[in-house]
Amino acid sequence: MAFTLTNKNVIFVAGLGGIGLDTSKELVKRDLKNLVILDRIENPAAIAELQAINPKVTVTFYPYDVTVPIAETTKLLKTIFAKLKTVDVLINGAGILDDHQIERTIAVNYTGLVNTTTAILDFWDKRKGGPGGIICNIGSVTGFNAIYQVPVYSGTKAAVVNFTSSLAKLAPITGVTAYTVNPGITRTTLVHKFNSWLDVEPQVAEKLLAHPTQPSLACAENFVKAIELNQNGAIWKLDLSTLEAIQWTKHWDSGI
C-alpha cells in the first residue's frame, strides 16, 4: 500500500551518517511533520542544514547509542512519544563495518536493531492498544551474499533480513509492518577503509571500490521511494542507483 510521508512523524536511528544524512535530506523534502534523529554524536551543522531545507519540518536530535540496555531505549522513546503523541515510522540505520570489532559489530548492527524494535513495540503493538506502525530496517546486499572477507559484518546483515522478514509475518498479530532496504556498495566513509576478519584481506576496501559503486544521494532517493512504496515484507535491493524488490527463495518451512 502506497504511503505518503506528508505530515508524518519519523524516528531515524543513525540519521546523520553517510547514507543516513542524505536520506534525511530527502525525507524533509517530503513535508514530514517531525523528523526525530537518534544518533551517537550530535552534529548541529547537519541538523541546521536539514531544518533549512524545509523549515516546515521540525527536526529534533536526541543522543542515542543502540548498544544501551533496552530499558534506556524505552525511556527515550517514552520521552519522544510524550512529545509527539504518535510516531508513524521507525528507521533503524545504525551500522559499523570493522571485522576487528566482533562484539561491537554484532551489538550495533544486529542486537541494537532488535532492541530498538522491541522497545517501540511497547508503544505500537495492537495487543497493548497501540496503533501499529512501520519499521524500515537498513540491511545490506551482503545479507544476500556475503563479502566473505568480512563475515561478521555480512552475518549481521543476513540476520537483519531474517529478523525483519519475521516481523513482517507477525504484522497481523502486532499491527506493525516491516521491510528491509539493502544498499549495495555506496561511496561513503564507511567503505573507504575497513578491516577484514583476521586480516584475511588487507586490501578489501580498495578491491571493492575498484568495482562499480553508487553515489550516496542515488541510494538515498531510492531509500525514500521504498518507504513510500511501503510493502510489508519487502526485501529491497538498492544497488547501482536502482531499486529492486528481491524474491527470496524458500528452502525450508517450519509448517507453523
Curated annotation (Swiss-Prot):
One of its GO terms (molecular function) is alcohol dehydrogenase (NAD+) activity. GO terms for biological process: alcohol metabolic process. NAD(+) binds at residues 12-35. Keywords: NAD, Oxidoreductase. Substrate binds at S140. The active site is at Y153 (proton acceptor). Its EC number is 1.1.1.1. GO terms for cellular component: cytosol. It holds the Pfam family adh_short. It catalyses: a primary alcohol + NAD(+) = an aldehyde + NADH + H(+); a secondary alcohol + NAD(+) = a ketone + NADH + H(+). Belongs to the short-chain dehydrogenases/reductases (SDR) family. Homodimer. This is Alcohol dehydrogenase.
